Amino acid sequence: EIRENPQADRVPRVFLFGAKAAPGYAVAKRIIRLINSLAAEINADPICRDRLQVVFLENYRVSLAEHLMPASEVSQQISTAGKEASGTGNMKFMMNGALTVGTLDGANVEMHERLGDENMFLFGLHADEVVRLKREGYAPQKLYARDENLRAVIDKLKAGFSDGVSYDDLASRLLMNDEYMLLQDFASYCAAEQRMADTYARSEEWNRMSLINIARSGIFAADRA
């Protein structure tokens, strides 16, 4: 979209990815490679690089998180509902004033009980909807066929990036065995990202939401436990 309409008014963004892959987790290693391919192409593009950047932070660990969490304005907690063990990273971002783009999964559910819809940017299926859709039959190919934006993303994975690496294997996995229903949640995620960007442009509202997140995070503090 940036390349097609470079003059559009957009909130500049930097996406920071911090992750590790277990030695035998081949798909996770491919996703990390994909992030780096994206970063190489986007960050070198004279049209995109002033509006969008991608950074992969190697060897993600506690000492790195201690710098990252206070500096972040947005926390992406996007696991498929019903799939994520309840962690605490999202709460640490909340305590530092970052606003959450996320699903109702894991500890996001507990945060949502304190914040409500109005202080988070929620998207995606709920856990019971995931179960029902799987039972009734989920066909990601149909979503690919009817969603132009989604189709462009999948086709880009197949075509590859400026470093010459193609991710046809990941594209096929999404189309044939989308275990985490990523394609189902795609349009909802894009809408949440747009709501987040629109809110960020209204600085007073954004700052108010950030302060509410900080104020209501006290229940998650280690001191209370």
Q: Can you describe what each PLM-predicted range is?
A:
Residues 70-72, 78-220:
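Catalytic binding pocket for nucleotide-activated donors in carbohydrate/polymer assembly enzymes
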Residues 3-7, 17-19, 204, 210-212, ...:
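Histidine-centered catalytic/metal-binding microenvironments
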